[in-house]
From Swiss-Prot:
Binding site for Fe cation 1: E23, E58, H61
SUPFAM superfamilies recorded: Ferritin-like (SSF47240)
Reaction(s) the record says it catalyses: 4 Fe(2+) + O2 + 4 H(+) = 4 Fe(3+) + 2 H2O
Protein name as annotated: Ferritin heavy chain
Domain of life: Eukaryota
Organism this protein belongs to: Echinococcus granulosus
UniProt enzyme class: oxidoreductase
Keywords of the record: Cytoplasm, Iron, Iron storage, Metal-binding, Oxidoreductase
One GO cellular component, as annotated: cytoplasm
The Ferritin-like diiron domain, residue ranges: 6-155
Keyword Ion transport applies: no
One annotated GO molecular function: ferrous iron binding
C-alpha cells in the first residue's frame, strides 16, 4: 500500500485508468489522421499539423493523469489501446467531424469521472479535473465545431485546400 494514499477511492483510481486509455486512444486516432493528411495523394499539411498537435496534446493528458494517479498513491493499470476504426478519411470535413465526436466522448467521460470524484467526496480530484481538463475540453469542442461549420460552408476540393492554407496553416487561434 502506498504511503501517500489518502482519501483516494478505488473507484476514482479505476476511472483514471479508463480515462488514461481513452486519452491514449484519442492520441492514436489523431496520429492516424495526421499521417493520412501527410500522404502525397491527400497533401493537406495544415490538417497534418493540426492532428499531429492534437495527438501530442492527448498523449500529454494521459501522462498528466498518470502522474496524478501516482501522486495520489494509485496504481496505473495498462490496457490495450484499440486501433482506429479507419485510417482513411474522404475529406477534411469527415476527419474534423470524427475529431469533434471523439472530443465530446472524452468530455462526457471526464464529466462522469468528475461525478465519481464528487460521489466519493474527493475534492482534490474534482479540482484537478476542473483545472486541468474540463475547461480545455469546452474550448476544444467549440473550436472543432467552428471548423466543421466552416468546412461545410467552403466545401470540398478548393474550399478545403483554402481552409487548410488560411485557417490551419494561417495561424488562426
Amino acid at each position: 500500500m502506498s504511503l501517500v494514499r489518502q482519501n483516494f477511492h478505488e473507484e476514482c483510481e479505476r476511472g483514471i485508468n479508463r480515462q488514461i486509455n481513452m486519452e491514449l486512444y484519442a492520441s492514436y486516432l489523431y496520429l492516424a489522421m495526421s499521417q493520412h493528411f501527410d500522404r502525397d495523394d491527400v497533401a493537406l499539411p495544415g490538417f497534418r499539423e493540426f492532428f499531429a498537435k492534437a495527438s501530442e496534446e492527448e498523449r500529454e493528458h494521459a501522462i498528466k493523469l498518470m502522474r496524478y494517479q501516482c501522486g495520489r498513491g494509485g496504481r496505473i493499470v495498462y490496457q490495450d489501446i484499440a486501433k482506429p476504426q479507419t485510417t482513411e478519411w474522404a475529406s477534411g470535413l469527415e476527419a474534423m467531424e470524427m475529431a469533434l465526436k471523439i472530443e465530446r466522448e472524452v468530455n462526457e467521460s471526464l464529466l462522469a469521472l468528475r461525478g465519481v470524484a464528487n460521489k466519493n467526496n474527493d475534492s482534490q480530484f474534482c479540482e484537478f479535473l476542473e483545472g486541468e481538463f474540463l475547461g480545455e475540453q469546452v474550448s476544444d469542442i467549440k473550436k472543432l465545431a467552428g471548423y466543421v461549420t466552416n468546412l461545410k460552408r467552403c466545401g470540398p476540393g478548393l474550399g478545403e485546400y483554402i481552409f487548410d492554407k488560411e485557417t490551419l496553416q494561417g495561424g488562426e487561434k
